[in-house]
Amino acid sequence: MSISDPIADMLTRIRNAQAVQKPLVTMPSSKVKVAIAKVLQDEGYIENFEIKGEAAKPVLHIDLKYYAGHPVIERIDRVSTPSLRIYKGRHDIPEVMNGLGIAIISTPQGVMTDRKARATGVGGEVICYVA
């Protein structure tokens, strides 16, 4: 079965796994998914991630993070979709929950948070919001 939006599938798998308190979630790996997982780890939303499996079909394993029995990620929402791409210039990058959350943005310099994109002075495609 073909997945029309692999990033939305990744975010949904994370959301569903945290809803039932799973410690680990697995999914097919890609460069963009690994970059998103790296941003989530750097910002403290997930414990760890690793790529396992053979080179032809790598699998991304994400260790989810909980605090006092509650998921650290309260909300994770897809913004830009394959049918409706959302691009923001360097001056129009949104703040999530007045700076309490992050927006993950795909820029020419790679995938990064909204704060890093503002500091670097680049815009790009808004992939998702995380709070």
UniProtKB/Swiss-Prot annotation:
Disulfide bonds: none annotated. GO terms for molecular function: rRNA binding; structural constituent of ribosome. PROSITE patterns: RIBOSOMAL_S8. The keyword Ribosomal protein applies. GO terms for biological process: translation. Keywords: Ribonucleoprotein, Ribosomal protein, RNA-binding, rRNA-binding. Transmembrane segments: none annotated. It comes from the Bacteria. The keyword Ribonucleoprotein applies. Gene3D superfamilies: 3.30.1370.30, 3.30.1490.10. GO terms for cellular component: ribonucleoprotein complex; ribosome. Part of the 30S ribosomal subunit. Contacts proteins S5 and S12. One of the primary rRNA binding proteins, it binds directly to 16S rRNA central domain where it helps coordinate assembly of the platform of the 30S subunit. Belongs to the universal ribosomal protein uS8 family. This is Small ribosomal subunit protein uS8. It comes from Polynucleobacter necessarius subsp. necessarius (strain STIR1). The lineage of its organism: Bacteria, Pseudomonadati, Pseudomonadota, Betaproteobacteria, Burkholderiales.
